[in-house]
Amino acid sequence: MAEEQVLNTHNASILLSAANKSHYPQDDLPEIALAGRSNVGKSSFINTILGRKNLARTSSKPGKTQLLNFFNIDNKLRFVDVPGYGYAKVSKSERAKWGKMIEEYLTSRDNLRAVVSLVDLRHAPSKEDIQMYDFLKYYDIPVIVVATKADKIPRGKWNKHESVVKKALNFDKSDTFIVFSSVERIGIDDSWDAILEQV
C-alpha cells in the first residue's frame, strides 16, 4: 500500500486531549481534523484506517468526545478528533462551548492541513453537516467528505444516496468525496490517498 511507504499507519497512539490552544501540541507536524455528527462513525473511521481495534473509543452514547483528541501517527502526522455535533442531550451551553473550541482550532491552527467531514450516506446531511461544510469552504480549509455506513445500503443505491448528499451540501467538485464502510473496509485506500495529498 502506498501510504505504508510514507508512514507506518499502525504506529499510532493517542497523544493528548485539549480544551483550548494552550494545550495543543507545540510542533509543526501536519494535522488532519475529523468532524461529524455524533454517532456518524468517526471513531470507527479512525480505528479502521489505522488498522486498530480500539485506538479511538467507539461509544453507543453519542456526544462522548468532549475535547479535541490528538492522535500521533508514526511521529509524522496527527489526526484530531473534534467533538461530535448535533447531539440533543447535551446542554445548550455545553454545545456552545464545544462550538467555540472547534472554531478556535479550525480557524487558528497553522498545523491543520485538511478536514475529513464525515456524513452518513444513508441520510440527507443534517443542518449541522451543511453548516460545517459551508464553514470550511468559507475559511478555505481543504475538505474531504467521507460518507460512512455504506454497508447499510445496497451497492446499487450508493450513487443515488451520494447525489442526495452532494446536492444538499452544494458540493464543490474540486473537493474529494469518498464512500466508506468500516464494516466492509471500503474506502480505506481512497481516504489515505486524499489525506496524504493534503500533507
Curated annotation (Swiss-Prot):
Residues 28-199 form the EngB-type G domain. GO terms for cellular component: cytosol. SUPFAM superfamilies: P-loop containing nucleoside triphosphate hydrolases. The keyword Protein biosynthesis does not apply. GO terms for biological process: division septum assembly. It comes from the Bacteria. PROSITE patterns: G_ENGB. One of its GO terms (molecular function) is GTP binding. Necessary for normal cell division and for the maintenance of normal septation. Belongs to the TRAFAC class TrmE-Era-EngA-EngB-Septin-like GTPase superfamily. EngB GTPase family. This is Probable GTP-binding protein EngB.
